[in-house]
């Protein structure tokens, strides 16, 4: 047993210190970034935000809606090959370039992903997703995927420490997904005692990944556009959002009605709800590590997307960053004990 004494921080523990700026307007800020990925050699340009690969967020409808904002969607892994074919037939090349194909690590997952990728060469992203990215089996699967799809951009996770981030990049991942337990409907930290405050995880993993020419995506923990700005300020190349994009018309959750008001169900992918839906229930050897919540219907996702992008532009103007790429170089975090005046929060 050992204890690390240095304090680890989440997004709620800091604010970004304002700095002098020559920008005259938020409209002067360029949010689009251009990337060339280490292993695939592929280039991509767009706004580096990703809708999470949850079946109540990462839907085909969400992908179509967010593509118009130049935002990526990691489409969840529970669509059939036939459903993928129908989506591809009805989607433009511009939509498909904003899509990630998600997969687990079983042999069946691998074969299904291969079939999906063979449907259209415009599908250039693969998101290999497990709750615990520290297993040797996962690393081997990433290497297998890289060998099978040398020109596809592979995003793999989740991990929260630099050494594992390096391991995944060396095994073939272009982007490492960072985050264990920070999600709004994730209970891993409560059920297992395992986790890592998200901002510190982002800072440390970004440092490790960038040293090898890789990239990271901060996955989880964002509750406001300000948190998205903090993730980019901490060094994240991409930011993945789940709860912030849930509850919309495009989110795909089941709608329930209580006392005349409609709600949409949103649940973690390790929750009892998810496991009942996709694998018949919670296996006797494990515990559910997610929860189910009812969200008031939030309308089209376009309004939320505009709010997030507007907040990002404003954050950049406060620190004098004319491009999103400059935000991390212009960011100084200050530790705080409060984030906002909450006097009217319950009204």
From Swiss-Prot:
NADP(+) binds at residues 108-131, 216-239. It is an enzyme of class 1 (oxidoreductase). GO terms for molecular function: GMP reductase activity; identical protein binding; metal ion binding. The active site is at 186 (thioimidate intermediate). InterPro entries: Aldolase_TIM, GMP_reductase, GMPR, IMP_DH/GMP_Rdtase_CS, IMP_DH_GMPRt. CDD domains: IMPDH. One of its GO terms (cellular component) is cytosol. Keywords: Metal-binding, NADP, Oxidoreductase, Potassium. One of its GO terms (biological process) is IMP salvage. Its EC number is 1.7.1.7. It catalyses: IMP + NH4(+) + NADP(+) = GMP + NADPH + 2 H(+). K(+) binds at residues 181, 183. Belongs to the IMPDH/GMPR family. GuaC type 1 subfamily. Homotetramer. HAMAP family: GMP_reduct_type1 (MF_00596). NCBIfam families: GMP_reduct_1, PRK05096.1. Catalyzes the irreversible NADPH-dependent deamination of GMP to IMP. It functions in the conversion of nucleobase, nucleoside and nucleotide derivatives of G to A nucleotides, and in maintaining the intracellular balance of A and G nucleotides. This is GMP reductase. It comes from Escherichia coli (strain K12).
